[in-house]
Amino acid sequence: MGVKSFVEGGIASVIAGCSTHPLDLIKVRLQLHGEAPSTTTVTLLRPALAFPNSSPAAFLETTSSVPKVGPISLGINIVKSEGAAALFSGVSATLLRQTLYSTTRMGLYEVLKNKWTDPESGKLNLSRKIGAGLVAGGIGAAVGNPADVAMVRMQADGRLPLAQRRNYAGVGDAIRSMVKGEGVTSLWRGSALTINRAMIVTAAQLASYDQFKEGILENGVMNDGLGTHVVASFAAGFVASVASNPVDVIKTRVMNMKVGAYDGAWDCAVKTVKAEGAMALYKGFVPTVCRQGPFTVVLFVTLEQVRKLLRDF
């Protein structure tokens, strides 16, 4: 069961991640919308996750207001200004991220779930499911953080002025450029946030899916089939979205920032709330739900089918 659970989770995660990539890109762009790009006022700050002796770097702040934009209009604008292919910017990083991060978290969750299940009743209570999700999500995020940073930057590149774009050729080029220009530690920029978010998402998503599915089956609402998998997975996606969105906004901004933009995650959160209001932490919530819902549905429906195919192995 050990290795097979990783294979099953990896296949399902890659399919789900790549098929919902455009929704994730729109979510990232919305989370960055309103963030200060540049101006003439220079402030000296240390980069996020900087070491104590790090030297400060200049950051250009802005006070200009930015009009609100919705996910549909943003998607249309991306297609008009950058072309339809832009909706798949960073998909190579998504592929790598799902291979590293999701394969690890999905496989490890199943391993822990099986290990912690009561041998007599054959059941696992909700608190242990959440614990398994927290552990699996944290380890998976630590493994996949370099691909996560590359993915965010590649997705966000099109919103920058032409002169400021990074123009990465692919995930390999993105990682090489970051290491060369910003050091190896840049690959783990925002890693504390990534790990926190992954722990929340994995615990909320996987534990709630199992809980919703068990509740539906035990109460005889539906049989164990496609309908049950879709309902349980969409509900799990909504729970994960509500729980993770604030951390996701800060994570996205820290990962995408130019050197010196924020003095760490807390500084990013404070500046975001101060400049844009508390609800800025739920920027991109609609596309988060619109992405997390389909992603979770595809993830678990695919996972259930892959399990059937690999049942005899």
Swiss-Prot record:
It is found in: Mitochondrion inner membrane. It is a multi-pass membrane protein. Induction: By cold stress. GO terms for molecular function: dicarboxylic acid transmembrane transporter activity. Coiled coil: none annotated. One of its GO terms (cellular component) is mitochondrial inner membrane. InterPro entries: Mit_carrier, Mito_Metabolite_Transporter, Mitochondrial_sb/sol_carrier, Mt_carrier_dom_sf. GO terms for biological process: cellular response to hypoxia; mitochondrial transport. The chain crosses the membrane at residues 6-26, 84-104, 130-150, 189-209, 230-250, 282-302. PUMPS are mitochondrial transporter proteins that create proton leaks across the inner mitochondrial membrane, thus uncoupling oxidative phosphorylation. This leads to a decrease in the efficiency of oxidative phosphorylation and an increase in heat production. May be involved in protecting plant cells against oxidative stress damage. Recombinant PUMP4, reconstituted into liposomes, transports a wide range of dicarboxylic acids including malate, oxaloacetate and succinate as well as phosphate, sulfate and thiosulfate. This is Mitochondrial uncoupling protein 4. It comes from Arabidopsis thaliana. The gene is PUMP4.
